[in-house]
Regions:
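Extracellular glycan/ECM-engagement signal in secreted proteins
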Residues: 116-142
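A low-complexity, Ser/Thr/Gly/Pro-enriched, surface-exposed linker/loop concept
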Residues: 50-102, 134-142
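N-terminal secretory signal peptides
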Residues: 25-63
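Positively charged n-region of N-terminal signal peptides that target proteins for export
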Residues: 1-4
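Processing junctions and N-termini across compartments
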Residues: 14, 32, 47, 62-63, ...
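Bacterial N-terminal signal peptides
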Residues: 6-15
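Sec/Tat signal peptide C-region and signal peptidase I cleavage site
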Residues: 15-22
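Acidic, glycine-rich flexible loop segments
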Residues: 90-125
């Protein structure tokens, strides 16, 4: 329990510091299965946005950590408004049980990102129509 609280407190401290330095939360949600949690934020200085989604459970084989990643790898997916999406190296969590649930069949839009969720997967794209599809069994980028 102490470890979980430390992770939550460190994550909240990170986001509080980030927001104080010119970032603003532009939206968040979780899937009805509570397996995927997503958040997007805007850099008010650079006028760009970023989005990340984190999975709780994956049944597919997770790629090995990149050589430059000594933290957790494989369960976090991120992208900017433009360009490719990728798996992330991270040492905290974005999962928050208080995120609003995005119901199956519904679409979420914010900051140039569009996500839709079905019973089979979550699909998110950016302004370039690049992004990812996530499910327990398959995580793919396009």
């Amino acid at each position: 329990m102490k470890i979980i609280m430390a992770v939550v407190v460190s994550s909240l401290a990170f986001f509080a510091l980030a927001y104080a330095q010119g970032f603003e939360d532009i939206g968040s949600f979780k899937t009805p299965s509570n397996n995927i949690y997503c958040i997007a934020w805007r850099d008010k200085v650079a006028n760009t946005a970023e989005m990340q989604c984190e999975m709780t459970e994956i049944t597919a084989k997770i790629p090995a950590n990149p050589k430059d990643c000594n933290l957790d790898y494989g369960y976090r997916f991120g992208m900017s408004q433009r360009g490719r999406a990728e798996r992330g190296c991270y040492g905290d969590t974005i999962k928050n049980p208080n995120y609003k649930t995005l119901a199956y069949g519904k679409t979420w839009k914010a900051g140039g990102f569009t996500c839709d969720v079905t019973t089979a997967r979550l699909r998110c794209v950016n302004l370039d129509k690049r992004g990812f599809e996530l499910s327990k069994a398959v995580q793919k980028f396009f």
